[in-house]
Amino acid sequence: MESLGATVKKPGSTVKNKTGSWRTFKPVLDKDKCIDCDNCILFCPEGCINREHEIDYDYCKGCGICAEKCPVKAIKMEREK
């Protein structure tokens, strides 16, 4: 089976309803560790990470997939304050 990569251009399926308030943990990127592999962008189910690796916290639900898929552990999940 062949797979095709894709990214979501707009965050979330409901642009009008910001869903970031659902989070318990949020991803925090250490840009010094980042190797620009773009796994975080490709695997984010909400499309909350842009090409500059900025995270749109208005829509990020804190699922942690970006941190899990980062090969150099440049993304850490931190508890919301």
From Swiss-Prot:
UniProt KW keywords: 4Fe-4S, Electron transport, Iron, Iron-sulfur, Metal-binding, Repeat, Transport
Annotated PROSITE patterns: 4FE4S_FER_1, 4FE4S_FER_2
Pfam families, per the entry: Fer4_21
Cofactor: [4Fe-4S] cluster
UniProt entry tagged with the keyword rRNA-binding: no
Statement: the UniProt record of this protein carries the keyword Glycoprotein: no
Residues that, per the record, bind [4Fe-4S] cluster 1: C34, C37, C40, C70
Cofactor remark from the record: Binds 2 [4Fe-4S] clusters.
Residues binding [4Fe-4S] cluster 2: C44, C60, C63, C66
Gene Ontology terms for molecular function: 4 iron, 4 sulfur cluster binding; metal ion binding; oxidoreductase activity, acting on the aldehyde or oxo group of donors, iron-sulfur protein as acceptor
Domain 4Fe-4S ferredoxin-type: 25-50, 51-80
Subunit-structure text: Heterotetramer of one alpha, one beta, one delta and one gamma chain.
NCBIfam families attached to this UniProt entry: PorD_Arch (NF040684), PorD_KorD (TIGR02179)
The name this protein goes by in its record: Pyruvate synthase subunit PorD
